[in-house]
């Protein structure tokens, strides 16, 4: 497998799939291409939002099935918003609230759940509502934070968190859930970006999109007294960088494809992913997102990509 000057992808011990809706098909194409060239998935995987489902498809070797199911569901869906049948077009909700769970069921069944249990460790992030009485305030703050956090490159160290007012980041493990419906619910919760996908109740508590709190998962203990620990040192030697690798779904023009930020390793798309994040109709270009991922993986394997 390809090495660059400071990085050997075979040394990655934890692979993180960030969220991004349909942009996560770039991750699917990228990793599927690496696997086709002989790479083996690390045994510790973390997924956020749609990235969690993509990770599950790669673990269970159902990525093609998941992509086909997505395209079929989108082809049968007339629009982003669902309307009540009748003469008056009364909106009743967002289509993804039905499409997304149906998509998960199309490629994650009992056999696939057994593969996830036998794989190693798959965790998905979600944002748990801690104070129901402040639900509206917590969600509004989370949405604004999420929009601000899209450009996490410019965030200061103190702006990363695993807890904000009313919400806490939690790691859910589908392999520990039984029956299958409860395992699927962890993936639904991780992508529950209200109002597009409604919150999911797990163990009596409401859970929302994992990306509401942080654009990338923040592990317990990474922040002490508002400061990052040594593994997030900005001056970390590239040769000693973390063996954790995060696959982004946004393109930052000031960064190369492979880069370090606060001591963490990231791979980003070579350009803006050509797909609508929340699109769910026949004209949603998920194939283009997947294809860009494949092309970027091929470029990654055959060229020397220097970190900053």
Locate predicted features:
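Gly/Ala-rich beta-loop-alpha elbow adjacent to hydrolase catalytic centers
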Residues: 47, 51
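Patatin-like phospholipase
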Residues: 1-45, 57-308
């Amino acid at each position: 497998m390809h090495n660059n000057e400071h990085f050997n992808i075979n040394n990655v011990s934890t692979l993180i799939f960030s969220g991004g809706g349909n942009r996560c098909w770039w991750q699917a194409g990228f990793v599927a291409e690496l696997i086709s060239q002989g790479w083996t998935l690390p045994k510790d995987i973390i997924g956020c939002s749609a990235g969690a489902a993509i990770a599950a498809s790669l673990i269970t070797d159902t990525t093609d099935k998941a992509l086909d199911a997505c395209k079929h569901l989108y082809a049968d869906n007339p629009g982003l918003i669902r309307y009540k049948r009748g003469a008056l077009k009364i909106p009743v909700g967002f289509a993804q609230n039905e499409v997304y769970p149906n998509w998960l069921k199309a490629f994650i069944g009992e056999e696939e759940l057994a593969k996830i249990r036998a794989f190693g460790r798959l965790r998905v992030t979600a944002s748990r509502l801690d104070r129901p009485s402040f639900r509206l305030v917590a969600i509004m703050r989370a949405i604004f934070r999420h929009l601000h956090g899209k450009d996490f490159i410019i965030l200061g160290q103190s702006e990363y968190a695993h807890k904000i007012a009313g919400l806490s980041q939690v790691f859910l493990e589908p392999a520990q859930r039984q029956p299958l419906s409860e395992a699927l619910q962890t993936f639904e919760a991780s992508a529950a970006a209200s109002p597009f996908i409604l919150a999911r109740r797990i163990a009596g508590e409401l859970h929302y999109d994992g990306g509401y709190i942080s654009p990338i998962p923040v592990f317990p203990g990474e922040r002490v007294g508002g400061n990052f620990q040594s593994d997030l040192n900005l001056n970390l030697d590239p040769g000693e960088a973390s063996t954790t690798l995060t696959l982004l779904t946004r393109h930052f023009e000031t960064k190369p494809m492979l880069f370090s930020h606060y001591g963490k390793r990231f791979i980003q798309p070579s350009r803006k992913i050509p797909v609508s994040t929340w699109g769910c109709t026949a004209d949603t270009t998920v194939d283009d997102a997947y294809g860009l991922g494949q092309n970027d993986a091929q470029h990654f394997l055959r060229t020397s990509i220097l970190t900053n």
